[in-house]
From Swiss-Prot:
Record-linked CDD domains: RlmH-like (cd18081)
Top-level taxon of the source organism: Bacteria
UniProt source species: Solidesulfovibrio magneticus (strain ATCC 700980 / DSM 13731 / RS-1)
The protein's name in its UniProt record: Ribosomal RNA large subunit methyltransferase H
Gene, per the UniProt record: rlmH
Reaction it catalyzes: pseudouridine(1915) in 23S rRNA + S-adenosyl-L-methionine = N(3)-methylpseudouridine(1915) in 23S rRNA + S-adenosyl-L-homocysteine + H(+)
UniProt KW keywords: Cytoplasm, Methyltransferase, rRNA processing, S-adenosyl-L-methionine, Transferase
Assigned EC number: 2.1.1.177
Amino acid sequence: MKPLRLIAVGQVRTPYFREACAHYLTAVRRYLPAEEILARDGKSADPARRKAEEAKAVLAALAPRDFVVVLDEHGPSLPSTELAALLKKRIEDPGRAPAFVIGGPFGLDKAVLDRADRLLALGPGTLPHELARVVLYEQLYRAASINAGAPYHH
């Protein structure tokens, strides 16, 4: 089984969000192998340039055969059970590892969006990127627990 790959731009700097991410990443790993890959933050003050810098790091972290799910406010949101089905299908695909990508404070460059096999929103609202990372990790834990038949999701 190929590991679930979580590719995120930058470190989580807020302590309680960092702790929550670590908690849910550990929880995900109870059910399936998962790795977190941190893409370097862009340094430019210009948002477009910064996203382009970050895109290079994100694209370098992706393997050619990854099934890339990019978090984007314009993507559809999925109920937890549908996310579980998507995760199960991707985990069971021997050729393509699932890779979830979450951007930094300015979002993701078009080059990353173009690389996506699927876009995914966490809901109709916009979340700060650190909170979005926590929510994604929790939803992936919930999806993995649904697939394992665990009682976390009622």
